[in-house]
Design a protein with these regions (language model features):
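Bacterial N-terminal signal peptides that target proteins for export
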Residues: 1-9
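Cleavable N-terminal signal peptides
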Residues: 10-11, 21
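Flexible, surface-exposed loop/linker segments and immediately adjacent secondary-structure boundaries
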Residues: 24-180, 185-187, 192-196, 226-230
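Low-complexity, repeat-rich tail regions
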Residues: 199-265, 269-476
Length: 476
């Protein structure tokens, strides 16, 4: 198939394709025409919700579908459907999806089978996971499966699930709240302080126990209380919990709530991180700062007294996620001096509240309206062509390979002060095309992954030679 690109304006953002995995293998497909907005009834819309890797301790890997190549997990990496996260013995990791915290202990493998606006479904292949759900709206969306059991919450709470720590056994411990556990032909309600041990043909209840993994998870919850941020942006904006520790809040008559990060005076948004191609959105920003998730996937950036501040916009129950809120400029017909050579270049700049976000992926008109609905941004017009505050420029060839575009390592223009006029609009190209037949292989993998819906047997996740110890946890 071929790519079809329409003419683009300077505010064009992120051309997206249908399939990608974190290992940077990308399937070539027909592209959506840039700026096209789909009717609400069309089903190809990208999710408006994504998670985040918020902590990595030790060796943690993340991959796409089962059988796809994995790569080391990275802080602030977006989490979406069919991601597979695995930890080595002694390692731990944490995922955040709004106010929901998901933590994996060492020697564990967790698959995000479905994550979108209406569902949060997980599958624990082996190991131990701790889940804290604090928002009542998330309760009906949540489901966790193992080989022996299906777990659903009936109220907000905290639970711990162990799979294959004992062979062919799942242990569901409800530490707070209440859960429904289905398995071995039985269905039972498990309340706080109790646990259900499920084998293929046997279910029994017992007292829940705790160990240092549970204590560590509770300590993380207590340390990540963000009272100020929750008042300004709510708790369902993924990454909110980091902001109180790394910046300060204020209120502006022009922009509403503003958050100012603790950074150097010459700091600029979207300059310390990398671009990675993630389906279905396309080029996605992964920031290096520990707080660098919410301010780069929601809201806008403004300059106040020559310093950058983040404006999250109106308070919403669950805001719409974006891969990056930037405008793109440059392309093959725009040459810039880098050291001793003139090279074709691409650049990007943070959108202000007065700039319109135009996605390059499928998005409904209702979500696009929410992304561009700024009640405070009524006094000025959008940035005029050639006036791109915070513009960052790198050689176009940086976007041509399979790997991510690591911005701090990329060459910079010789005369950046001259890059303020005459820059055409153009989004960067997708990465290299995957090998022929990859789409068919991927479809087979997806069918095996959807065992709960298709009935196809899922491949085993046993690893020969590794004996899993029996849990010994003190009673609550």
């Amino acid at each position: 198939m071929t790519h079809r690109f329409a003419p683009t304006a300077a505010l064009l953002v992120l051309a997206a394709f249908s399939t990608s995995v974190p290992a940077q293998t990308v399937l070539q497909t027909d592209a959506l025409e840039q700026g096209q907005v789909l009717d609400d009834t069309q089903l190809a819309e990208a999710p408006g919700r994504a998670g985040r890797i918020s902590l990595v301790q030790g060796k943690v890997d993340i991959g796409g579908d089962i059988g796809a190549e994995s790569s080391p997990a990275q802080l602030n990496w977006p989490i979406t459907s069919r991601n597979l996260i695995s930890t080595a013995p002694g390692a731990r990791t944490e995922l955040r999806i709004g106010s929901t915290a998901i933590r994996l202990d060492g020697d564990s493998s967790l698959e995000v089978t479905e994550l979108d606006d209406d569902s949060l479904r997980l599958r624990l292949h082996y190991g131990s996971v701790s889940v804290r759900v604090m928002n009542v709206d998330v309760v009906p969306e949540f489901e966790l499966r193992t080989a022996q059991a299906t777990v659903r919450l009936t109220q907000p709470g905290r639970l711990r699930v162990d799979a294959e720590r004992e062979r062919d056994t799942s242990l569901v411990s409800v530490l707070d709240g209440e859960a429904q556990v289905d398995g071995a032909g039985a269905s039972l309600t498990v309340r706080g302080g109790r646990a259900a041990q499920v084998r293929d043909e046997d279910v029994r209840t017992l007292q829940a126990q705790r160990d240092n993994f549970d204590d560590w998870s509770l300590t993380r919850d207590q340390a990540l209380v963000a009272a100020q941020s929750s008042r300004h942006i709510g708790t369902e904006m993924t990454g909110y919990e980091e902001l109180d520790r790394y910046g300060s809040w204020s209120t502006s008559s022009d922009y509403g709530s503003l958050w100012t990060p603790q950074v150097a005076a010459d700091w600029t948004p979207y300059r310390d991180g990398s671009w990675t191609f993630i389906a279905p959105w396309g080029w996605t920003w992964v920031d290096n700062a520990p707080w660098g998730y919410a301010p780069f996937h929601y809201g806008r950036w403004v300059q106040v007294r020559n310093r950058w501040a983040w404006a999250p916009g109106r308070l919403e129950r669950r805001p719409v996620w974006s891969p990056a809120l930037v405008g793109w400029v440059g392309g093959s017909n725009w040459n810039v001096g880098f050291q001793s050579h003139n090279l074709a270049a691409h650049g990007w700049y943070p959108l202000s509240p007065y700039d319109r976000y135009v996605p390059g992926y499928r998005l409904s008109s209702e979500r696009l309206r929410r992304l561009n609905d700024w009640r405070h941004a009524t006094r000025r017009e959008q940035q005029q062509p050639g006036r791109y505050n915070g513009l960052t420029v790198v050689p176009r060839e940086q976007f041509g390979g399979r790997g991510p575009v690591i911005v701090p390592r990329a060459p910079r223009p010789n005369r950046p002060e001259q890059l303020v006029s005459g820059t055409p609009g153009s989004a960067p190209p997708p990465p290299l095309v995957a090998r022929p037949g990859w789409n068919r292989d991927r479809r087979d993998l997806l069918e095996r992954a959807n065992v709960g819906q298709t009935g196809v047997e899922r491949p085993a996740f046993e690893r020969p030679g590794l004996e899993r110890p029996t849990l010994e946890r003190p009673a609550l």
